């Protein structure tokens, strides 16, 4: 598998020598050493676990330069050069590869090529040797980290602990901060919001992890993770809403309104600054933050309103949620008051903070980055938003229907608010409990599970409509197989952000609702190190030009990444497909006639007792038990690999035999073959240290799985009563043909030669839609039905 490396910054030999001297890797007297002496010293310096020169020299005999000679013996002959093969053998062993198991000592260069390592060359001078080691320290090891990070995990940089300054190497920050003495504290930011109605501004607990060096003169930037889950998660999955019910006439919709909560203006910060008096007991919940904490970036967490030990109530996706999370940044930049404890007597300041703030986090934590960024708050320099919701309607609804996130049937805004209302665990907080119960009733009514229609309630939770307020640089990360936060969330915010005068990048991986910072195929953590050094330390290191604007992981070969200028329909050419009465999906023949299927609702699914995931696979694979409740149209086999890009669109002329109806459409890759695993395989658990005796991550990657018959590419759903307007329902008569036109979730998917594309038209999606208790007939007029794709 290829260890692709995008974060290495091209560096001159002169600059490389300067950086090696600065970290005490290259000895000051290097010019007086012979080639062989220098080779021994530099190799030994990689072995950070050996703390004396004698111990380092003793270990040289453990390394082979070829299949006959160890490094110590090789050095006895005082060589003045080393061949590419010999150096590759030493380098591969330093990188963690095992000779005779991972590669052959007689052919190490093939191993380097296999893993996409930098090319090894004959080294005939000390200058070449020095630069070769510089490049080696910046090369990804078998554990996925660059060799310098492996050395850090063994204690190499403890020699710099206590110096109280950032050190950079190849444009990235080094772990020179004492992780054994991290300051862990809690403060209480006062909000302008009074969401619990007690007449006082809500107090928001904020947990800070920062380098001990920031106690003195050093000011450090902050990585802020807005996490509603930080105070704890209330498990309420057993009380999720019932989805086994018939559809409701959507014309009963009343357009529920958003109603703002009262404000209580917080006092301006005074000159008082008392050190924090509460120790943090919560743990960091995001690996990238821990990695960068060892490199000098403070890590800040807050769940804001409704979180454990704080005030207020959770109001999922609301402007109040955005305001409360933004207020934490205002404290970090000196513009908002915070207290040492809940008595509100003593103010405490973030004097340790440089005023530069970046944001990190996935899912809800990524969502709040989008929300806060739209406010344009001072001090927020960049966001790295992973698997984020950009409109809450697109999370819990779609085209006039109640639609669940994957594996979350019955969840909704009110249930998620309860999950995150961790101050309910503070038994004495009766104020919050009473306000929470009232808010739950309001959320239940306003979210309108009866009709699923767009409303003012949902409009207030659409961050994309405020995208023009974004002033910070932007990185979005999303899984192309994420059916929790569906891909159109990132696609639609990307269409906005890419037009703004801010630097922006997009990463799309093959995962579901997942992180990508520890994949084999990309050095994402190193890229983020480079990025945050540029954005928060304000060091010009070429980060903006270092990698392509859009990077997309291939669905056939996990270690292949596509560089694109954008992610949009116009990456491809439009192709129109028509379904025909004999079950073909054709580019040359128009469909005629009508076909009918009978939807069984959730009755058969409930009887089967299988999971929603198992149902979906059996359904898309064409198992008769489930396929009979659908219409399936298959293309001819593709002669050449074909990549689908952007958002497919369908037009379906359909009639139902009832006055309500829901239509689902799926695109499926057919053909029995190996496909990538749904989630990455862990190669080694806990093998990526963030620093010395600190936290760690696990190397992982998608790998070929056992053969399957089919794979879902994309899908979408629509309420038949929205045939005239996506934002307003219309009356539907039984037997009335209506023309539905809607887009599917966006994709970037390569169909290999020999694959078939299958269009499935159905109604009940057991994992996402409501599951009616009665059957319903749907008749599709093929003359008014078509599929528009964009193909590369």
Swiss-Prot record:
<comment type="function">
    <text>Removes N-terminal dipeptides sequentially from polypeptides having unsubstituted N-termini provided that the penultimate residue is proline.</text>
</comment>
<dbReference type="InterPro" id="IPR013736">
    <property type="entry name" value="Xaa-Pro_dipept_C"/>
</dbReference>
<dbReference type="InterPro" id="IPR008979">
    <property type="entry name" value="Galactose-bd-like_sf"/>
</dbReference>
<keyword id="KW-0031">Aminopeptidase</keyword>
<dbReference type="InterPro" id="IPR008252">
    <property type="entry name" value="Pept_S15_Xpro"/>
</dbReference>
<dbReference type="InterPro" id="IPR015251">
    <property type="entry name" value="PepX_N_dom"/>
</dbReference>
<feature type="active site" description="Charge relay system">
    <location>
        <position position="513"/>
    </location>
</feature>
<dbReference type="InterPro" id="IPR029058">
    <property type="entry name" value="AB_hydrolase_fold"/>
</dbReference>
<feature type="active site" description="Charge relay system">
    <location>
        <position position="363"/>
    </location>
</feature>
<dbReference type="InterPro" id="IPR000383">
    <property type="entry name" value="Xaa-Pro-like_dom"/>
</dbReference>
<dbReference type="GO" id="GO:0006508">
    <property type="term" value="P:proteolysis"/>
</dbReference>
<dbReference type="GO" id="GO:0004177">
    <property type="term" value="F:aminopeptidase activity"/>
</dbReference>
<dbReference type="GO" id="GO:0008239">
    <property type="term" value="F:dipeptidyl-peptidase activity"/>
</dbReference>
<dbReference type="Pfam" id="PF02129">
    <property type="entry name" value="Peptidase_S15"/>
</dbReference>
<keyword id="KW-0378">Hydrolase</keyword>
<comment type="subunit">
    <text>Homodimer.</text>
</comment>
<dbReference type="Pfam" id="PF08530">
    <property type="entry name" value="PepX_C"/>
</dbReference>
<dbReference type="Pfam" id="PF09168">
    <property type="entry name" value="PepX_N"/>
</dbReference>
<keyword id="KW-0963">Cytoplasm</keyword>
<keyword id="KW-0645">Protease</keyword>
<feature type="active site" description="Charge relay system">
    <location>
        <position position="482"/>
    </location>
</feature>
<comment type="similarity">
    <text>Belongs to the peptidase S15 family.</text>
</comment>
<keyword id="KW-0720">Serine protease</keyword>
<dbReference type="InterPro" id="IPR036313">
    <property type="entry name" value="PepX_N_dom_sf"/>
</dbReference>
<protein>
    <recommendedName>
        <fullName>Xaa-Pro dipeptidyl-peptidase</fullName>
        <ecNumber>3.4.14.11</ecNumber>
    </recommendedName>
</protein>
<dbReference type="GO" id="GO:0008236">
    <property type="term" value="F:serine-type peptidase activity"/>
</dbReference>
<dbReference type="GO" id="GO:0005737">
    <property type="term" value="C:cytoplasm"/>
</dbReference>
